[in-house]
């Protein structure tokens, strides 16, 4: 079974879940809020705002003020620098995600196992499932076995507490390292380099992708990474063809 079929299966499950919850959004919102309050009532933040005594959306609005990232940053700093637990939630913190920093300092948020699973299924597998159903409906064909370059770096960087931090969009692929060779032309050493800041990947991404006749997709989180790669191809196609021909 192609590994893309596994992505389709996980995506189908997530799409069914989305369909179920969007049938009655307010009911889903109320259930989700109650679940969050129940699970995190014993965290420092939960005790501060009295999560244990909140039983409705209206009560939550009255007791919990509107907040910004600045309200949570001190908790995140304590987790990173002091390795403190049960601050914002009671689940086990597995790793961190960061924003791009395009509008200032990158915002770092801790992620639990449940968060990572949701990011995996909704952030990655749903798109594969949606593409598969679209191709089947419009062309009457199966989604081809997926193979192509992933133009991104998944290594991340370690923080003071030893846990790694990636951009949120990278996380779903971070945990697929053991199986990337089944759907990715980019070798693991290129996706998970030891010193990513020293590596320009354009040549290597193209060198491995152009030599593979089974390429069916181009993958990236940011489209400019793909356009940069194609700019490199336009300027250096003769060298790439020569290297492929000679087996360099």
Model-predicted regions and their roles:
Residues 1-98, 104-248:
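Nucleotide 5′-phosphate-binding alpha/beta core
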